Each structure stands twice: as structure tokens, then as C-alpha cells.
Amino acid sequence: MSNIKNNNDLSKKYDHKICEQQFSLWTTQKELNKKNLKANKNSYSILLPPPNVTGNLHLGHALNGTIQDCLIRFNNLKGLSAYWICGMDHAGIATQTKYEKYLRENKISNKDKSRDEKVADLFEWSQNVGNNIRNQWKNMGFFLDYENEHFTLEKKSNEMVNQVFVKMYNDGLIYRSKTLVNWDIKLQSAISNIEVIKKEVETNLYYIRYYLSNSKDYLLVATTRPETIFVDECLVVNPKDKRYKNYINKFAINPLTNKEIKIIADEYVDIQFGTGVMKCTPAHDFNDYELGKKYKLNIISCFNEDGTTNNYAVGFENLKIADARVKCVEYLEKNNLLEKVEKTISNVGFSERTNAVVEPMMSEQWFVKVSEYSKKVIELQKSSKKIQFFPIKFEKNLINWMTNLNDWCISRQLWWGHQIPVWYKKDSKEIYVGTKPPKNEELYVRDNDVLDTWFSSGLWPITTTDALKSKDALFPTNVLVTGFDIIFFWVFRMMFFSLYLKKEVPFKHCYITGLIRDEHNNKMSKSLGNGVDPNDVIEKYGADALRLFLLSSSSPGEDLCYVEEKVKSCWGFINKLWNSFRYVEMNSSDFNFDEDKTPKNLEDFDKWILNKFNKAYSEFLQQFNKYNFLVSIKKILDFTWDDFCNTYIELSKNRTSNQESKLWVLNYLIKKILILFHPMCPFVTSNLYDNFKFKTKDSILLERLDFKKISNLKESSIEDVLQIINKIRIFNFENKIPNNKVIDIHLEVLNPKLFKISDEVINILNTAKINIVKQDIKSLKPDYVENNYLIFILNKEDLLGSNNEANNIEKIKKEIEFVKSEISRCNGMLSNKSFIEKAPKEKIELEKSKKEKHEMKLKELEKLLSSHK
């Protein structure tokens, strides 16, 4: 027996709120974090994807964090020095726009404030948001090192960002160029290609007449953007298009400026689109821009950075783009230059952050050359040193995306973020790039722009581990858990920087989560109003129930449907675990448990449950190590609920034989179950462990998962006995027979080698209110037919009354119909090509197993039906 003090305040009923208030692990976790941070070997580390300081965490964050917390606890229990690196992201554009919205809503102006004052105000605002996030982490029970928390805009991060920028500039990987970029008019900032979301939009296709110089003849041009005609540089036709062969190298008149523009030929033009004549406006279209460079055309924009027309839109200046389009169309129509208008579907780019239409804009920006390192990432993923993706399909997506990747535009016209470490000399074109200001700083002006937030986020694995003492042990981290939506934004950039700076991968495994959808399989969104606040779920069911639901519903890369009934069911499981623990404790008051001393006189029933546990534990480990949480947790959930609680505990309640072996097994298994479920349900398991009479550690986190397998556990007829009990329970349930009624049965053994009616079999059946009676059964029909025995219920008429034969036959027929429908459903799933191609292997195997069980059940029922005829 342990000398460690127990908490004797365990309430009779499970109350998640009390359980969470009495969580005793904060101190242990704090001490373990200090110890694990200093460890130089047997380390296991995870980097928390830093949440944006823009608001509260949603269910996706809860899923992502719960998976990581589960892995950290699991590996601590395995004896590794598991450490979870945490922090938050300043999230440049997202945070600045959220803050400016807050200012507008509260009628606060910061126009007269300096840049430093604005940054200080936003930093304070972000700290308040950060406090809310921190509280949510704690509400979820996350095993984070709160004393070593990081921020992507902290001093250490800024130093790292500046050092890397300077190094990349000196290595020729960063350059400045005036070029066509994606411009967010709402932000008045450049954004990168992957921050542009393409959406299909119905718009007008305008057919406009471009008259030839000194001629009444004209070419018809189809365009969706008449407001850019002012800066058309030429018309382009395909040299293979016979319709326009005679027009090449002639001149047409710009319908809005009356200036001459040349007609040129290039195979880029799609003969089938519109009229086959294309207007080329290099400053307002990326494809036109490439043609402009090819033919050395002028590249002039008729838009200002705020989305209004400029002086090149002669007669239409200072109009918003949408208004300019209307005015231009009116002018063209009035002057008989508009021939017709058709509806068409266009792929329009929208800002991922502001949802504003993105405009191509000529602008001087900073870029990172990515082609060299994108090739290195592809080469890496083809080598033995590759990062393993779960599921692997996302590795293929990443590689496909990295082929022919454009350079990364890293400058943003914002004030919240890492200011670019570049100074321009006032009286010359000299540029100074450095981690510190130049000498004679007053002669220079610093670049006002900040870096794309993904620059500091891409350095996150290096910044956070370099900031810690045991950086070599923590880098690379073991696994990154992240959503598929930021593979290109973040995962690639971490790989890029790690290969560039460390010449190794930033993490060994990459687990990709799917989306969380509502119970109708709709994506959760504010517009649909179907979002779920994790705080509300925790308030109602507790963090453990939410965590268990999320983990037991998770497969790599698969979407997860939030169903409240399933969370409620998880609460029900935890409640059952609580009651089972109390039963074991109450019955062990006079018992001395020694885990290392397995009783020599274990009964077959004890061996059966220990074998069941060994199998469930082994299968759990096998699947858990592949990140198949849905399958792995189901193994131990089913064991705990069905085998341990509903079978072993229930049948042990009336057991009188061999109490020592029974109590040893009960205590052994309840302890192992608590340890196994701790990574999923830390609050309830730590609370129960604190009250475990025979605990040997101060904390459940100090226990170990390396369970020693108990050998020599051969047992004979227990599965058959339990099958008999199950049949009788079903019989009682279907016929509404009270549980306290004794059922008299006769067992006709068909295979004595496989099934024997021993004293233990009789005792187990007796505990289930089943009495074995020997009787001549020649004139009787069996109620249940099994492979090894027949079951005859002898007191059926007393229990049901007469005339029940027809009812029994009808019930069997209904059950046959149900089983056939289930077999048909399984066949449908297994013949579905999409399911076979996309579903995890474990799900397919599970469906095959279900089908096999249903087919066996059908044979059994058909045999039973024939015996009643």
C-alpha cells in the first residue's frame, strides 16, 4: 500500500465543474516543464501554431490544441521529456484591421498619433486579447509552459527577423523591384499571391468598337474592364487567326482617349474567347504585364492606390473603380462605341483578409526568391530525410503547389509588424540594410513598410527554440499539428527557412487536421450562424467531454462534424468511469493491492478481462502511434465501457468466489485505465488518481504507460458465457422482463472440446440471474443457436405468458430484415470508389469487419428461424 496522501473529498456524483476546479496538476506540469526544458536527451517537442491575437479561440483551435496536448501527455507518460513550445502571433494584417474596426466602432481616432504610439496602443489591446486566449488554454487543461510564452513581435523575434532579412539580402535572396503586385485597396497594401482567393463572379462582358486609324472599319474587343481602356497600350490578335491577318501592325484608335495604339500579333491570344481581339493593358492585368515586358510597352496605371481613378483617366478622374466603369460604359454607349453586352462568369481575385477585390498595381516592393529553395524542399521530400505527412495526400499537394512558384512579396504597407530593416539615404540612391541603424542616421529615412506576417511565422520554430537554453534538444520538433488551409502559407515557409538557416527540417511529422463542420456537414461560419464557442461546451459538459469527443472523432486530414449528442455521450462515459472508480474504491477498503504481485489463482473470468485489456492496449498503441486517434481511442473506449464496466464490474458485483483475485484485477485495471485516458481527459483522471487508495506517485503525470504484459492468461469458455448472458439480456430487454427475474435455461453443448459447463461458468451465469437446469429437451425448440451450444429458455411461458411463439418468430424476422439492411449498407460503402480511394485504411477495415459480423449474425438468425418452423 502507498504512503502517499490521498484526497478523500471525492464526491458521489461526477460534476465536471468541481472536477476542473480541483485540478491538481498545474504545479506538477510547471515542474515538469522546467525539468523537460533542460533535458538534453529523450526529448520530445511540439510547437504550438501561434493563434492570432485577434479574438477568442474557436473549435478548430480546440481540436488542434487538444491533439497536441494529448501527444505531450502521452509522451510524458512514456518517460520522454515532452515539452510544448507556446506563444501567440501578432498577425499583421489581421490584427491591424481588427483593431481599426474596434476603433471605428468605439469612435476612437488615432490619426494624429505617431507610428510608435499606434504600435504601443495596439500592443496593449493585443495583450488583453492574449489574456483571453491564455484563459481558454487553461480551461482546456493545456500542458503549456506559460512562463516561457513567446510572441512573434517580441524583441527576440524582431532580432531574429532582422538578422535573417540582412543575411538573405546579402545572399541575394531578397531584392527590391517595381513590378505588378496584388493590391488590397481596402488595406492599401500589397499582398502575396496565396493571399488572393479566386471566386467565380457573374459580370458583364462589353463588346467595344476600336476604329482603325483613318477608317470607318473597326475591331470589336470583348472586355470585362472598360474602366482601364485609358491606359491600353495595344490590341493583340493571334497570328494564326485568319480573320485579322491584314490588321497586324496597323493602328487603332483608343475609344476613350482617341490616341493611336498598335495592333500586334502574339500566340497568347485565345482565338475562341470573345472576338479573338484582346486589348493589352500592362498595368492592370498580370498576363498583359508579361506581354508588356516582352514588347517593351509602357506600363501605366489609371488607378490610385486608394482605388480611385487618377489623371490618366482623362475626364473621369477621382472616381471609385466601380463608378468609373459605369461612367465609361455610358460614354461608350452614347458615342456608339458599345456594340453589345453579355453576361459572363469571371474568376475574380479577392483579398483573403478583407474580402476586397484585389487590383493589379504597379508598386515598388520587397521580394524573396523562392525557386531555389522550393526545389530543395521538393528534393528533400523525395529523400529519406523527408517530413512525413499524415495523411500523405497533403505532401503531394504541397509539392504540386511548389512547382513554378512565384517570388514571395514580403513588404506590406502597414504599421503593425516587423518594420523592414532598410534605410534610404536622403540625398542619393544609396540603400543601407542592417540589424542596427546606419551611422549618421539623420541622413537616412527608414523604409515605412513592415514584413509579411508569415516571415516571422516562418521563422517561429527557429526563433522559439533558439530563445530557449536546450535548443538542440528541441529542434527539430517531433510533430507539427496544423490545418490544411495554411500548408502553403506557413508549412512551406518553415521548411524554407529551416533548410536555409539550419540545413534540416523544422519538424519530423506533419499532422493535418480537417475542418470542423456542423451536424448537417456545413462549414461553420459567422454568416451561417452555426459556430460553436468552446467555452459554452465546457460550461455545459466540461473540458474532458469536449476533448474526448474531438479526439475520438479525429482522423488525419478528415473533416469532423460537431454533434452535441456525441459530446453528451462522452460526458456519459466519463460519468461511468467516475462511478466505476468509486465502486472499486468502496470495495477495496480492507484490501492491500500490490501491482507487482499478480495473484496465482486468477479465475478464467479474470484472465479473460486481462487478455481483453492487453489486446485493447496493444491495438491502442499501434493506432495512436500512427495518429489514428479515432480508431485508437475507440479500442480503449469500447474496452472500458463494454468489457470492464458493463461486463466485468457488473458480473463481479455478485461474485463470491476468489475475492482477492477479483479486487486485484479491479484495482489493476482502474489504475491502468486512468493512466491510459489521462492524455484525453486530464481533469477527471488526475482527480480520480489523487483519490486512488494505492497510488504510488504524487501525480498521475509521473506514472508510466509502459505497462508490463501479464503472461500465461489462458482462459477457456468465457466468451461463450458472455454470449449467453448477452442473449438473455437481449431477451429480457425485448420482452420487458425485470432484471431481478431469474431465467432458467438448459444448455445443450455441441462441441465439448471448445465449451464446458464448469463451476465457474455456472457461477458467472448465476451472477447474471441465469440458472442452468438439466432437462430433457427432445420436444423443445432452441431459442438461440450458437456454434458450440444451443440455448433453451425453460421458464419462458411463466415470464411471457402463452402464445409467444408467433411473437418470437416475428421478432426474428424483423431482426433478419435489419441485419440484411446493414449488410446492404456495408456493401454500398465498400463498392463506393470514392470511399475506397479517400477513406483511411482503418475505416475501410472497420466497414469490412462490420459486414463480416452482420453476415455471421444473419446465418445465426436464419438458423434460429428455421428451428421455430
From Swiss-Prot:
GO terms for cellular component: cytosol. GO terms for molecular function: aminoacyl-tRNA deacylase activity; ATP binding; valine-tRNA ligase activity. It comes from the Bacteria. It holds the Pfam family tRNA-synt_1. SUPFAM superfamilies: Anticodon-binding domain of a subclass of class I aminoacyl-tRNA synthetases, Nucleotidylyl transferase, tRNA-binding arm, ValRS/IleRS/LeuRS editing domain. Keywords: Aminoacyl-tRNA synthetase, ATP-binding, Coiled coil, Cytoplasm, Ligase, Nucleotide-binding, Protein biosynthesis. One of its GO terms (biological process) is valyl-tRNA aminoacylation. A motif ('KMSKS' region) lies at residues 523-527. This is Valine--tRNA ligase. It comes from Malacoplasma penetrans (strain HF-2).
